[in-house]
Amino acid sequence: MFIKICGITNAQDALDAVECGADALGFVFAESPRKVSVETVREIVKQLPADVLTIGVFRDHVSQDVVNTVREACLVGAQLHGHESAQQVAEVMAEVNWVAKSVVAGSAEASGSNNYGTEMILVDSANPGTGTGYDLSLLAQLPKMINVILSGGLTVVNVAESIRAVSPWGVDVSSGVEFSPGIKDRLKIREFITNARAIG
C-alpha cells in the first residue's frame, strides 16, 4: 500500500513521517494554510533519504512553472490538483518523473480520468485539505487499469475500512494526521500507516 503524507511544512514532520513508514511526502505550493516556499522545501528534502518520493502539489499553475518549481525544490514528482487539461498534464509528464492528476469524486473529470495519460489518479473531495470525505461508491465510475490514490477525509479511524471498501493503489492524508493545519501529529501518522498497512 502506497502511503503519502501531504501538507508537510517542516523538517521534523517530514522526518517523522519517513521514520513511521511513509512512501511519499507532499509539499503544497498552491494557496493553502500548508503552503510552503521553494527554499523551505529544498532544505527539508536535503535531510531525507534518497528513496523517499517527494511531491509538489500544484493547483492551476502554468505547466512550465510546475516543472521549474519541481526542479528548484529538488523534488521527484508533481501532483496537479486543479483544473489542468490533458495537454497540461502531458507537458508536465514530459519533464517530471512522477505525475499524479487529482480529480473530484463524482465529477466528469473522474469518470474520464484515463484521458489524462497518467497512471496515477488521486481522488479527493471537492474541498481538499479540509478533512471532508465523500461517498466511496463514487469511485466505481473510475476507468479500470488506473492506479487510484484515495484521498479526502481519511483518518486513523476510517482508513482501514476505506481501503477494504475500494482497494485503492494508495492513500493520501493531510488533515487527518494533524494537530492543526500544517503541523503533523507523529502518533497519528504512525497509527494511520499501521492501520493502512494492516489491510493493504
Features from the language model and the residues they span:
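Conserved N-terminal beta1-alpha1 strand-loop-helix module at the mouth
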Residues: M1-G200
